[in-house]
Amino acid sequence: MKSKILCNLFKGKSCICLYTNCLNENNVNKCYYNLVRNYSDHVKDHFNKPRNVGSFDKNEKNIGTSIVGKASCGDVIKLQLKIENDVIKDARFMAFGCGSAIASSSYATELIKGKTIDEALKIKNNDIASHLSLPPVKIHCSLLAEDAIKHAIKNYREKVLT
């Protein structure tokens, strides 16, 4: 069973454990599944206190909405942008997935607020991954966030043109 548990394992490094039975009263310093991943402080911060969680009314003309996902890992991100005069005034997200997907989504919403549409389209997954110090096996989460930005802008532009 997956769960969010902060623990101090392996030489005192702080990590996010993916399994509830990793820790128990008898053996708090051993992960039975050895599937603990070390995350940066930025990932832990955005995972534990995600910014801009929620949604807007997708029927509003100035709201661009995207839903992107990766079937192989089960991550799904819904991103919505509130755009006025080609400037992203606000952003909201909802995510179902791992800590890296949540952190990537949360950071992406902070990164794009106040940017023009053209500036937001220049954001690459590397901007997100490098800030969060994502490990190589979690880079796909930053790719999802980049795709979500692009698709939300595309949706907004389609709505404005109709």
UniProtKB/Swiss-Prot annotation:
Which pathway does the protein contribute to? Cofactor biosynthesis; iron-sulfur cluster biosynthesis
Q: Where located?
A: Mitochondrion
Instruction: Provide a GO biological process annotation.
Output: iron-sulfur cluster assembly
What cofactor(s) does the depicted protein rely on? [4Fe-4S] cluster
A GO-annotated cellular component: mitochondrial matrix
List the coiled-coil residues: none
Lineage top rank: taxon: Eukaryota
Record Gene3D superfamilies:
3.90.1010.10
Q: What GO MF terms are annotated? A: 2 iron, 2 sulfur cluster binding; ferrous iron binding; iron ion binding
The UniProt entry's sequence similarity note says: Belongs to the NifU family.
Q: Briefly, what is this protein's role?
A: Participates in iron-sulfur cluster formation (ISC) pathway for iron-sulfur (Fe-S) cluster biogenesis. Plays a role of a major scaffold protein for [Fe-S] assembly; assembles [4Fe-4S] clusters directly upon interaction with the catalytic component IscS-Isd11 as part of the scaffold complex. Can transfer [4Fe-4S] clusters to target apo-proteins.
| Subunit organization | Homotrimer. Small proportion is monomeric. Interacts with IscS. Interacts with ABCB6. Component of a complex, at least composed of IscS, Isd11 and IscU.
What is this protein's name?
Iron-sulfur cluster assembly protein IscU
Organism of this sequence: Plasmodium falciparum (isolate 3D7)
